[in-house]
């Protein structure tokens, strides 16, 4: 390719650009995976968002992280597949549709199952694509040709296969068990769908009278209404207080049922009174106790949370209404002893947002222990999967150890209907707990099995319940690749490489996937689990619907562009697994952090425009652009690289090395920050500025060409480095830089990621260049502090005893003069500055000098007079020597202006500046009316006479010192107040401390400046 390079538009338009390239990538199937191609596979399956959902900031954060990894590995040459899809979300869909039906005055039961499912599919078709289209706006590099849905035909086949297989192996069973029941959704929920909340409640104490009239026992409970289902009272067999009561009976208040007093080791003698009411149908511990002691199981609740006929006079009342009425009745009858305030934990339904009830119910269960043990074996023997950060391994392991059997049936209609068919002809056309059934992969298979067992006239009815959504989600990593069929996708891309997900679904999803995969495929479903943190709001609070503090990512995309949001979310990650804080002004609908990323995009755009504007006369072929072979820079014959060229190339390869290391180890935030600092700082602020003079038309042709080639080489490398983080703007610039034809299918997304050439990394050169940059920056700062006009040329004197540093300064003197606007630059040997102790500068230095001179002269005269009286001839000698020495001392050290300044500096040492390494050092010896600073061991002095108005500058410095001292004193006062330090938020106190340190530093610097103006 030898096209002449044209330029970019003057302004970057993210909205047009992003839409253009998203369309291009999808239409050209850039991200379509091919299992028949070579290359090490890199596969990620998307954590499927609910089909009901819309994009929230958590989705955007997770998608940005995944896409960064996927794009990086694709550019590394791996055979990459990111597989998209959505989850059918049974409970969420039911919640939405049943609200709609309620508004119409209907229920789903009135509508009927068939009509309800028709409405569900219709709703999915109309609204289900919302989140998919929103994901497209994020520019995610997924293979849309492989998009899956957990209710599609292939996944339904996988679900049936898994269910039947587990049932045949005895790992799925139907049984009566105590389940978590959500009255709001009227469905069982699994343990991991239950959220425990600490609440302020009550502990009620009641008397239960002994049937023989000899007394009573006292029990305590947080759920008084459940006493209507009590079938015993239990005590610990070792509790001497109650041993004599074991075997006796009690008469239950209200119901008048006679119940036994039993002994059980489970009872804690220290809890309450040591007597525990036993309600086997409504408490898990009581359920186990009831089975051990063969107690009756009395269910008092309907599925909607009201009391059933076993509630007697309270039947039909809501559980919480019944609670109040039961307490009132017991108080009236004299059985209420006391009510205590009691803080305790209450289980809530994650979906229904109401307290769940332990309810005795016939459900389908997975026998979880054999599956969990396989996952534990992989973890303990092979550290598979590997968790990043590693601390989540223990959380995952503890969960696997403590699992109990998984209730997988849900009393819903939208979802995978349980593949079990009841022979209702055997139980008078009704499904009962005793109705025989067959389990099959299809209706036809069910009929064949049923006919062989029950005869040709058998009548079948499929189980009305559906499977827990997490059952199908647990199969996601391999069912989406074609399992149970042995497909090319499954062979190439399974097990998948990385799972990126939040810590909050390790229990819901990650453990389920590893158990299912371990059982059905004999492998863990992914090599690495990268656990990310939460996106927190501007006040560092977790974003949630209930807190109403979420930030719509689409709003930020519409305001700043997709790349700006993506880059912000990734850059803010301080370390793997850490939460991020997103700055946001809700009144203005503005995000300073995303705005900063947009500014970064604009900075890159303007830098690219500058580079292209200065590549005239050269073609893409001359520059080696777009060839895919830009790992090393080959300058034209006879073109010598300058010091700046060699420095930027070294820095570029150092950044490649660092970026690759960070991404390979999931340090995405560190990688993003490193690229940012290189582009904004090294490339834009320094290298481009350093080469501007070499790009002039009248510059040396060879030097100009070297600058052009280096600029083009580094710019293309920058675009590749940054592409995984900001894909749209980098694609747009790269297409223009490499002059791709409009109909070309070439894309930056498929270019090779830069590889570091360690031979081009020169740490010594980078250190040397740091000295030049530090010197330029110091001169610029001194100019600004002295208010030297921007266009004014100045004199700068540099002194250092280091021969090597003088050589560096001399080699880079043209850079110093150009960038610091120095007309005359001297570089000379000089003493290295020494560390000093700061003392307060004094005023009236001339007066003080004269007074000291007079005192010294007088003291010497008196000493000589005393000596004359005591030692012959000695007085004359000392009179001559003493008076002569005194005259020399006063003249040399107090009256001569330059010497006076040196003398006073020893007593009234000026405040000092920090050098590059942070050591506080004395300012260099400066000429009168000059300003000075230090960088490393180099002393920088800028004479100001004739450049600025010294008196005006001195007055301004004195005012600034006074203001800074006042601020520092105010902050000291606040920080010395115990009420402020102890009661103010920690971040506010720290901010005050930081402000004080900054104010004191400012005072120190300003005093130094004032001293050099004396």
Curated annotation (Swiss-Prot):
Binding partners and assembly: Monomer.
Protein name in the entry: Valine--tRNA ligase
GO molecular function: aminoacyl-tRNA deacylase activity; ATP binding; valine-tRNA ligase activity
Motif annotated as 'KMSKS' region, chain positions: 542-546
Family named by the database record: Belongs to the class-I aminoacyl-tRNA synthetase family. ValS type 1 subfamily.
Localisation per UniProt entry: Cytoplasm
Function recorded in the entry: Catalyzes the attachment of valine to tRNA(Val). As ValRS can inadvertently accommodate and process structurally similar amino acids such as threonine, to avoid such errors, it has a 'posttransfer' editing activity that hydrolyzes mischarged Thr-tRNA(Val) in a tRNA-dependent manner.
Main localization category: cytoplasm
GO cellular component, one term: cytosol
Segments carrying motif 'HIGH' region: 49-59
Comment text on domains: ValRS has two distinct active sites: one for aminoacylation and one for editing. The misactivated threonine is translocated from the active site to the editing site. The C-terminal coiled-coil domain is crucial for aminoacylation activity.
Catalysed reaction equations from the record: tRNA(Val) + L-valine + ATP = L-valyl-tRNA(Val) + AMP + diphosphate
Organism: Nostoc sp. (strain PCC 7120 / SAG 25.82 / UTEX 2576)
List of residues binding ATP: 545
Swiss-Prot/TrEMBL GO biological process terms: valyl-tRNA aminoacylation
Coiled-coil parts of chain: 947-1014
UniProtKB keywords: Aminoacyl-tRNA synthetase, ATP-binding, Coiled coil, Cytoplasm, Ligase, Nucleotide-binding, Protein biosynthesis
Gene3D superfamilies cross-referenced by the UniProt entry: HUPs (3.40.50.620), Isoleucyl-tRNA Synthetase, Domain 1 (1.10.730.10), Valyl-tRNA synthetase, C-terminal domain (1.10.287.380), Valyl/Leucyl/Isoleucyl-tRNA synthetase, editing domain (3.90.740.10)
E.C. designation(s): 6.1.1.9
Domain of life: Bacteria
């Amino acid at each position: 390719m030898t096209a002449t390079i044209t330029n970019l538009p003057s302004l970057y338009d993210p909205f047009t650009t992003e839409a253009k390239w998203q369309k291009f990538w999808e239409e050209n199937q850039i991200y379509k995976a091919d299992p028949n191609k070579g290359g090490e596979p890199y596969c990620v399956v998307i954590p499927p968002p609910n089909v009901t959902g819309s994009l929230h900031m958590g989705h955007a954060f997770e998608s940005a992280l995944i896409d960064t990894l996927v794009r990086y590995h694709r550019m590394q040459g791996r055979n990459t597949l990111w597989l998209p899809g959505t989850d059918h979300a049974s409970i969420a869909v039911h919640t939405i549709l049943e609200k709609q039906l309620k508004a119409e005055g209907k229920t789903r039961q009135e509508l009927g199952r068939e009509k309800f499912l028709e409405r569900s599919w219709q709703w999915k078709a109309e609204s289900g694509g919302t989140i998919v289209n929103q994901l497209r706006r994020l520019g995610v590099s997924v293979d849309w040709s492989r998009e899956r849905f957990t209710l599609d035909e292939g996944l339904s086949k996988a679900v049936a296969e898994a269910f039947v297989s587990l049932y045949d192996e005895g790992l799925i069973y139907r049984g009566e068990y105590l389940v978590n029941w959500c009255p709001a959704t009227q469905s069982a929920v699994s343990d991991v769908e239950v959220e425990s909340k600490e609440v302020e409640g009550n502990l009620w104490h009641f008397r239960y009278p002994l049937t023989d009239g000899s007394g009573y026992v006292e029990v305590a409970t947080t759920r008084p209404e459940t006493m209507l289902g009590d079938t015993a009272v239990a005590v610990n067999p070792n509790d001497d207080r109650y041993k004599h009561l074991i075997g006796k009976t009690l008469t239950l208040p209200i119901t008048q049922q006679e119940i036994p007093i039993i002994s059980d080791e489970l009872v804690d003698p220290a809890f309450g009174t040591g007597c525990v009411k036993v309600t086997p149908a409504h408490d898990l511990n009581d359920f186990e106790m009831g089975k051990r002691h063969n107690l009756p199981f009395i269910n008092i609740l309907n599925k909607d949370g009201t009391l059933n006929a076993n509630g007697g006079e309270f039947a039909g009342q809501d559980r919480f209404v019944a609670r109040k009425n039961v307490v009132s009745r017991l108080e009236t009858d004299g059985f209420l002893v006391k009510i205590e305030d009691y803080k305790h934990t209450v289980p809530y339904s994650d979906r229904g947002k109401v307290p769940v009830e332990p309810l005795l119910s016939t459900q389908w269960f997975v026998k979880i222990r054999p599956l969990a043990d396989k996952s534990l074996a992989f973890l303990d023997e092979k550290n598979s999967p590997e968790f990043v950060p590693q601390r989540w391994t223990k959380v995952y392991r503890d969960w696997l150890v403590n699992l109990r059997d998984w209730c997988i049936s849900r009393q819903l209609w939208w979802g995978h209907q349980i593949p079990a068919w009841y022979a209702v002809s055997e139980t008078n056309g009704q499904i009962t707990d005793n109705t025989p059934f067959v389990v099959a992969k299809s209706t036809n298979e069910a009929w064949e099995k049923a006919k062989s067992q029950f005869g040709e006239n058998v009548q079948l009815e499929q189980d009305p319940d559906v499977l827990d959504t997490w059952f199908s989600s647990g199969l996601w990593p391999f069912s989406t690749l074609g399992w149970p069929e042995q497909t090319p996708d499954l062979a190439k891309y399974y097990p998948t490489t990385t799972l990126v997900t939040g810590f909050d679904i390790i229990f819901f999803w990650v453990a389920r996937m590893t158990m299912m995969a371990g059982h059905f495929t004999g492998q863990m479903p992914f090599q690495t689990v990268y656990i990310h943190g939460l996106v927190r709001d501007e006040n560092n609070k977790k974003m949630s619907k209930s807190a109403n503090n979420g930030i719509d990512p689409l709003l930020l995309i519409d305001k700043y562009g997709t790349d700006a949001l993506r880059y912000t979310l990734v850059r803010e990650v301080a370390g793997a697994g850490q939460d991020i804080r997103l700055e946001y002004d809700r009144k203005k609908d503005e995000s300073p952090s995303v705005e900063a990323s947009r500014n970064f995009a604009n900075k890159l755009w303007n830098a690219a425009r500058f580079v292209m504007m200065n590549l005239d006369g050269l073609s893409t072929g001359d520059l080696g652009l777009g060839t895919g072979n830009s790992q090393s820079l080959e300058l034209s014959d006879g073109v010598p690289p300058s010091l700046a060229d060699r420095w930027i190339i070294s820095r570029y390869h150092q950044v490649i090395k660092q970026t690759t290391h960070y991404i390979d180890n999931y340090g995405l935030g560190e990688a993003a920050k490193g690229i940012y600092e290189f582009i904004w700082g090294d490339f834009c602020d320094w290298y481009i500025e350093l080469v501007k003079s070499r790009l002039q038309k009248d510059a040396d042709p060879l030097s100009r060409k070297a600058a052009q080639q280096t600029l083009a080489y580094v710019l293309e490398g920058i675009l590749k480095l940054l592409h995984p983080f900001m894909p749209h703007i980098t694609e747009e610039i790269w297409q223009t830089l490499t002059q791709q034809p409009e109909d070309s299918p070439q894309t930056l997304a498929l270019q090779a990621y830069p590889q570091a050439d360690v031979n081009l990394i020169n740490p010594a050169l980078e250190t040397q260049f740091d000295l030049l940059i530090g010197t330029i920056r110091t001169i610029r700062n001194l100019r600004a502090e002295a208010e030297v006009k921007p266009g004014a040329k100045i004199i700068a004197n540099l002194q250092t005893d280091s021969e090597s540093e003088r050589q560096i300064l001399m080699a880079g003197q043209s850079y110093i003069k150009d960038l610091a606007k120095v007309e005359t630059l001297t570089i000379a040997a000089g003493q290295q500055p020494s560390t000093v102790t700061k003392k307060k500068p004094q005023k009236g230095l001339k007066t003080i000098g004269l007074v000291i001179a007079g005192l010294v002269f007088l003291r010497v005269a008196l000493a000589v007079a005393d000596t004359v009286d005591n030692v012959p001839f000695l007085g004359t000698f000392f009179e001559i020597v003493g008076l002569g020495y005194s005259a020399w001392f006063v003249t040399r050290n107090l009256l001569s202006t330059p010497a006076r300044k040196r003398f006073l500096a020893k007593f009234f040492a000026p405040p000092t500046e920090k050098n590059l390494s942070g050591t506080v050092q004395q300012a260099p010896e400066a000429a009168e009316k000059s300003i000075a600073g230090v960088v490393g061991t180099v002393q920088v002095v800028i004479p100001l006479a004739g450049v600025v108005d010294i008196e005006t500058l001195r007055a301004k410095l004195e005012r600034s010192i006074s203001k800074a001292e006042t601020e520092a004193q105010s902050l000291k006062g606040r920080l010395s107040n115990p009420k402020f330090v102890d009661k103010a938020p920690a971040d506010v106190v720290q901010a005050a401390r930081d402000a004080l340190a900054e104010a004191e530093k400012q005072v120190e610097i300003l005093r130094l400046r004032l001293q050099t103006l004396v």
